[in-house]
């Protein structure tokens, strides 16, 4: 065996040095590759492991009525998210409690509160990743419960982030007008959709830092800029609508009452300023609560006031009458022969009651809604003029109102019209319209001939108070002369005072209007048997109109004539509004004085001992005051404050009421008050 020599030791030492050098060089090369080549990738992986990317939603701008009363506001509320890796067995928090399954405990405790399936929640907790939303914009009570569970059970990886939640202060009131937003803070319908770019702030994106246990690091934000953005919320404009909240409430209440009484499939009502085009009130049925819009059918989201198309029936007759007056074919005194029915080609058209009045002036044709006279006028006008004037009055095209979802309506091509088509159009059939189109056209009669563009956005105000945008009166065109408008107003006033619209009369006030009853169009074409559209449109006072209103009921059950079901809604709604707004009767004949000191009734002279007030009780009910000694206007205002409905008897000063003073009632209750 060869002896180990000094030279052998040197050789082995050399090999060891070479080996160490190779290892060292390998480490250097590896570090260099990681530091230079993969630096960006590794940095991203590190950030992904320690941060969660979030988007901060800023509160949307407010929506208020014409007087600044809030309709839609944003409040800050907690949104719950989980860091699944922070709940894993490898996290420091989990290792500190090795005897329990944190994820199972969290799923069992939170599922009932969050109204989520336990197993689905458990899978979320075990799915990995650093950030998963569990529930966004929670209710305050719900958030409080969850925070308590997390704290008491020391559950890791569960955190809250403050987010903006939209709140509609009056619930169902003006629901279709306001619309609603989705979970991503984007407007999905109504004004929320129409002005989404104005109301929605810019999203702030930032990263939330977490420690090895999955707990949010103090401060929580990766950079100082993001922290300052979260602390200082973006200020956004306020949108003022033309709506009057008090009038809107009365209108909504009237719609609810109408649906309850008639069992109609749907309804729409609009109140408009006939001289400016401002929408003061607008309601649609069925309706919904935008705070919980997903609990309602999509049909309830639709605003029938602008989107429903139907044949107008007799409410279209004043429009055709204006055509004849403008063309010089007729005057209010032109005599027509009403035989009760009339044959046009192979079609026989009857009056609504089948009766004939003989020789009568055109004013009587309008007053009693006589089909035969209107057909004769329509045939004299002819297809071309009928369609041309209908277009001038705004039919067949959208009004341009600043709301989404408006329909155009349908007009014939005059070249395709046969004689029966001309005849039926003259009585409001064979033409499809929307409620807003009809009301706008009638407003042209009310205001002296101006066709206006209706609008519902009064102004948009910046946070500093400057006006960004302001709605204004827009005259689309003059469709008739003031003389023609005056003649038709007089005839429409006779409809209410002497004709088929008596059920719309309000004692002491001059009302002009027109009833309408039309067969409902069937989806497959033709008409739906036994289904009708009942409507009434009018304005008050007849000589100097302040309010124009349309009421339309879709398929009422039982009574279905416009005079039976729609005209009374017009009357009851405007009666409350006229009193509340202090608009005095123009005709005091048969009416007691509104002045308490002029009455001869001792009870009516009795002054209120204290100023009556509506009191909201702890149980949510409303305590009625004693209305004795106050006038109808103040009574109506008080009841509107409590979302109560007034059913007045007489006029002047209150002396009796039902329910009695101090009775506790719920919202929507009708309070009967007698005045002298």
Residue map of PLM features:
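Second-shell loop/turn segments in exported
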Residues: 50-52, 81-99, 107-111, 128-137, ...
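Short, small/polar residue-rich loop motifs at catalytic or cofactor-binding pockets
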Residues: 55-59, 263-266, 454, 648, ...
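Conserved, well-ordered alpha-helix/loop/beta-strand core segments that scaffold catalytic motifs
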Residues: 222-267
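Hydrophobic alpha-helical transmembrane signal-anchor segments
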Residues: 3, 7-41
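Beta-lactam-recognizing serine transpeptidase/beta-lactamase-like catalytic domain environment
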Residues: 72, 213-230, 269, 274-314, ...
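Short beta->alpha transition motifs characteristic of CBS
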Residues: 58, 74-86, 184, 281-287
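Small/polar-residue-rich segments within soluble enzyme cores
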Residues: 105-112, 123-235, 551
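Ligand-recognition elements built from short beta-strands and adjacent flexible loops
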Residues: 508, 522, 551-555, 561-567, ...
């Amino acid at each position: 065996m060869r002896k180990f020599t000094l030279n052998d030791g040197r050789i082995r030492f050399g090999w060891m040095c070479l080996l160490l050098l190779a290892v060292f060089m390998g480490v250097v090369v590896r570090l260099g590759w990681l530091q230079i080549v993969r630096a960006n990738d590794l940095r991203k992986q590190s950030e992904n492991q320690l941060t969660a990317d979030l988007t901060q939603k800023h509160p949307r701008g407010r929506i208020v009525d014409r007087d600044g009363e809030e309709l839609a506001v944003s409040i800050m509320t907690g949104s719950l998210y989980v860091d699944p890796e922070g709940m894993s067995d490898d996290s420091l928090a989990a290792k500190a409690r090795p005897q329990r399954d944190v994820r199972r405990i969290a799923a069992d405790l939170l599922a009932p509160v969050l109204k989520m399936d336990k197993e689905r929640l458990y899978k979320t907790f075990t799915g990995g990743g650093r950030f998963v939303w569990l529930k966004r914009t929670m209710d305050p009570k719900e958030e409080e419960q969850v925070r308590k569970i997390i704290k008491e059970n020391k559950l890791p990886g569960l955190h809250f982030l403050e987010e903006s939640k939209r709140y509609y202060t009056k619930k169902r009131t003006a629901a279709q007008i306001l619309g609603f937003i989705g979970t991503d803070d984007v407007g999905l319908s109504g004004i929320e959709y129409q002005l989404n770019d104005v109301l929605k702030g810019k999203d702030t994106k930032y990263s939330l830092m977490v420690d090895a246990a999955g707990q949010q690091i103090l401060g929580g934000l990766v950079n100082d800029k993001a922290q300052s953005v979260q602390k200082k919320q973006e200020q956004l404009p306020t949108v003022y609508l033309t709506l009057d909240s008090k009038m809107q409430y009365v209108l909504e209440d009237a719609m609810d009452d109408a649906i309850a009484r008639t069992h109609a499939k749907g309804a729409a009502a609009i109140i408009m300023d006939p001289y400016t085009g401002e929408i003061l009130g607008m309601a649609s049925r069925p309706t919904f609560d935008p705070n919980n819009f997903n609990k309602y059918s999509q049909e309830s989201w639709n605003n029938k006031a602008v989107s429903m198309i139907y044949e107008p029936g007799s409410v279209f007759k004043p429009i055709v009458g204006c055509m004849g007056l403008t063309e010089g074919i007729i005057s209010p005194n032109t005599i027509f022969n009403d035989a009760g029915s009339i044959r046009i080609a192979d079609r026989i058209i009857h009056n609504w009651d089948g009766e004939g009045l003989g020789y009568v002036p055109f004013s009587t044709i309008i007053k009693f809604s006589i089909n035969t006279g209107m057909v004769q006028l329509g045939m004299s006008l002819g297809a071309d003029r009928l369609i041309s004037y209908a277009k001038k009055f705004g039919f067949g095209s959208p009004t341009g109102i600043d709301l989404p979802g408006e329909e155009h309506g349908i007009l014939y091509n005059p070249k395709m019209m046969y004689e029966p088509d001309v005849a039926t159009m003259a009585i409001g059939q064979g033409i499809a319209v929307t409620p807003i189109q009809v009301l706008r056209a009638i407003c042209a009669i009310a205001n002296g001939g101006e066709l206006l563009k209706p609008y519902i956005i009064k102004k948009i105000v910046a946070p500093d108070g400057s006006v960004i945008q302001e709605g204004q009166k827009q005259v689309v065109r003059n469709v008739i002369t003031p003389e023609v408008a005056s003649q038709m107003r007089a005839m429409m006033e006779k409809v209410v005072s002497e004709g088929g619209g008596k059920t719309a009369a309000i004692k002491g006030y001059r009302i002009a209007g027109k009833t309408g009853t039309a067969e409902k169009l069937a989806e497959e074409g033709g008409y739906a048997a036994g289904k009708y559209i009942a409507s009434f449109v009018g304005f008050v006072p007849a000589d100097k109109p302040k309010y124009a209103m349309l009421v339309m009921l879709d398929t009422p059950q039982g009574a279905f004539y416009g005079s039976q079901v729609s005209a009374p809604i017009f009357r009851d709604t405007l009666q409350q509004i006229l009193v509340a707004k202090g608009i005095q009767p123009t005709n005091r004949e048969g009416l007691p004085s509104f002045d308490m000191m002029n009455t001869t009734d001792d009870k009516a002279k009795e002054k209120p001992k204290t100023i009556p007030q509506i009191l909201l009780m702890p149980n949510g009910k409303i305590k009625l005051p004693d209305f004795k000694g106050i006038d109808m206007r103040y009574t109506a205002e008080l009841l509107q404050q409590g979302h109560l409905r007034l059913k007045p008897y007489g006029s002047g000063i209150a002396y009796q009421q039902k329910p009695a003073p101090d009775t506790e009632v719920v919202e929507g209750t009708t309070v009967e008050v007698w005045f002298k």
